[in-house]
């Protein structure tokens, strides 16, 4: 009898890590859900894989491994990236300060401030050399300036270097030579060339993507290297290991380690759900051709996507964590409505849900891990929507009394409500949170519905 072969998909969220194992020959699925380990998500993944092994799965039979993660997203949101230096054409160091005209949020905000530069002026170096709009060399690269810059940035403690020259997307020769020189002087540096990260017209969007790539590349490389070591040690030795990209495609782990396309993983987790949802209606008699709205709710947020003609809608421009990111991605709208979303009373005395989340650590009050802020999950227990004795398939017991006490103390009593009214109010508030972006969601859904009807 031939040994079984499997395909494993792993999605690491802010609260839980989900693993789905497909028996290729039998077509059966096995599922594991474990708590995410925020300090090192690889630990949660290996716990889930260990659970499969305990159920009799031969881990050496896993022939394909696909991974959706928020590791780079969280690093950007929390500003936990690497120390970055920037090399740019002589006379253009102010580009990172001026940026573009795009604003996130309220365009009428008189006090709007652009996010601080990833590579400050003290770590920015101007390099002689120019390439024109057609790709012709107007001025040769000043290689001595590159050597001086690399040595100075190394001495300053820089870990990652971004290189962004004018019209490099037409002729990458100067950037490529710069990268080679940096490797001679500073072999341990992570190097991001704009011609590799985002080879397209528009100076600031290309620079922004390159800087973000340089900022996050060491974070992702360290994580993937550690995960690969743990996978090999566990017996998962397949080399078919892939990381989900923002556009719903995949990149090999090797590409994630080299760091040329790190920035394409910023929406890795949500993209996987939207891409998978596009396949679900294809066998229902033609629904795949109609407009579909998908909702992917986890412990921290809810991601909304639109599917038309059997494929998710895509965009090539966007803003992530207040920073411009013009890379191909699925068109996703995120709202702060998840099981771990914290419930609180604002200064006006109104009930609010999120955007803060209790995450996996400490988690909701009912987890009993030191969390003292009531969450949607705690309200669900009070409403009777969750069985505290059978959470995560019965592997985790929830403290219903602690959930009630937290809601009573922090929500019901201050708002002069009964406990039941407070819990029900939280459920209603989640609906309101889901309407925070009604214009975008409604308009796009209406367009899909109109298109679908016209195509019948």
Task: List where the protein language model places each region.
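N-terminally biased helix-coil "hinge/interface" segments that flank
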Residues: 1-456
């Amino acid at each position: 009898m031939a040994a079984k072969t499997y395909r494993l998909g792993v999605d690491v969220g802010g609260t839980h890590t989900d693993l789905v194992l497909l028996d290729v020959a039998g077509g059966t699925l096995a599922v594991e859900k474990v708590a995410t380990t925020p300090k090192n998500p690889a630990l949660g993944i290996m716990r889930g894989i260990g659970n499969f092994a305990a159920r009799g799965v031969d881990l050496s039979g896993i022939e394909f491994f696909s991974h959706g993660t928020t590791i780079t997203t969280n690093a950007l949101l929390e500003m936990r990236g690497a120390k970055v230096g920037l090399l740019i054409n002589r006379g253009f160091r102010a580009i990172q300060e001026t940026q573009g005209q795009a604003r996130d949020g309220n365009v009428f905000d008189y006090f709007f401030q652009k996010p601080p530069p990833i590579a400050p002026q003290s770590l920015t170096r101007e390099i002689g050399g120019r390439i024109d709009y057609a790709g012709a060399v107007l001025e040769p690269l000043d290689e001595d300036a590159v050597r001086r810059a690399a040595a100075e940035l190394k001495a300053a403690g820089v870990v990652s270097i971004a290189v962004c020259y004018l019209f490099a997307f037409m002729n990458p020769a100067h950037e490529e030579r710069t990268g080679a020189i940096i490797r001679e002087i500073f072999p341990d540096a992570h190097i991001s060339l704009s011609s590799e990260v985002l080879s397209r017209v528009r100076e600031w969007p290309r620079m922004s993507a390159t800087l973000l790539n340089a900022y996050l590349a060491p974070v992702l490389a360290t994580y993937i290297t550690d995960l690969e070591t743990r996978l090999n040690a566990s017996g998962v030795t397949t080399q078919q290991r892939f990381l989900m990209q923002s556009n719903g495609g995949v990149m090999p782990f090797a590409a994630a380690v080299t760091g040329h396309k790190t920035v394409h993983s910023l929406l890795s987790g949500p993209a996987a759900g939207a891409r998978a949802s596009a396949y679900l209606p294809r066998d229902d008699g033609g629904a795949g051709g109609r407009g579909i709205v998908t909702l992917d709710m986890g412990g921290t947020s809810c991601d909304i996507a639109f599917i038309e003609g059997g494929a998710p809608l895509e965009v090539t421009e966007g803003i992530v964590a207040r920073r411009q990111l013009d890379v191909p991605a699925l068109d996703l709208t995120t709202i702060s409505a998840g099981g771990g979303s914290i419930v609180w009373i604002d200064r006006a005395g109104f009930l609010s849900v999120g955007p803060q989340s209790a995450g996996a650590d400490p988690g909701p009050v009912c987890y009993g891990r030191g969390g003292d802020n009531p969450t949607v999950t705690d309200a669900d227990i009070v409403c009777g929507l969750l069985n505290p004795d059978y959470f995560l398939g019965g592997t985790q017991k929830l403290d219903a009394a602690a959930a009630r006490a937290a809601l009573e103390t922090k929500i019901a009593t201050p708002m002069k409500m009964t406990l039941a009214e407070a819990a029900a109010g939280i459920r209603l508030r989640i609906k309101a949170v889901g309407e925070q972006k009604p214009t975008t969601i409604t308009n796009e859904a209406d367009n899909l519905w109109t298109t679908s009807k016209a195509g019948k």
